[in-house]
Amino acid sequence: WGTSVFENDSACDFILNVENSPTVITDELVRIREIVEEEDYLEVDEGSSVLAMAELVLNSFGVNPIHEIAKKIDFTLIKETVALTFLNQLISLLELVLDVDNNNRSELFELWEEADPKDFAEWKNISFDLLEGIKKIRDEQFAN
């Protein structure tokens, strides 16, 4: 368990699923959105998957260097599946994971909040960088 995106089992499991089928990224986004709509809360596993998803999208657009664990993924297919709607939904989920609205609907955020303050700050910085990166891709790729 660590502060970077892929230093947890949930993100690693997500990576393996995407390796087998890059389009699973869209299915996972839909599944997580349905959970949020039903429960108005995001468990730690889904929160970790959202962060991993954001990292993979950034990788597919060449924004971040590809982490060793994700070297086998076909990023071309991921990039082809990313549309404006996908990015907007991903942004909403990232904001929920990061508790932007202060509504305490993210187990992952709560766990990091209880961690060592230095680790929490590092995790937040990494995670907010993902959010900003996704917003930038949306704005650059889908500007009117």
Description of each model-found segment:
Residues W1-D40:
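Short terminal alpha-helical segments
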Residues E7-F14, V50-V57, F109-E110, F128-L131:
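Amphipathic alpha-helical elements of HEAT/ARM-like alpha-solenoid repeat scaffolds that form extended
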Residues D9, D40-G47, L77, T81:
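Short, solvent-exposed segments of well-ordered alpha helices
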Residues I15, E19, L58-F61, K135:
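Hydrophobic/aromatic-lined pockets within catalytic cores
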Residues P22-R33, A54, A83-E95, K124, ...:
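Hydrophobic core segments within long, regular secondary-structure runs in both alpha-
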Residues I25-N64:
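Short, well-structured hydrophobic secondary-structure segments
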Residues A52-E114:
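Amphipathic protein-protein interaction modules
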Residues L90-N144:
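Low-complexity intrinsically disordered segments
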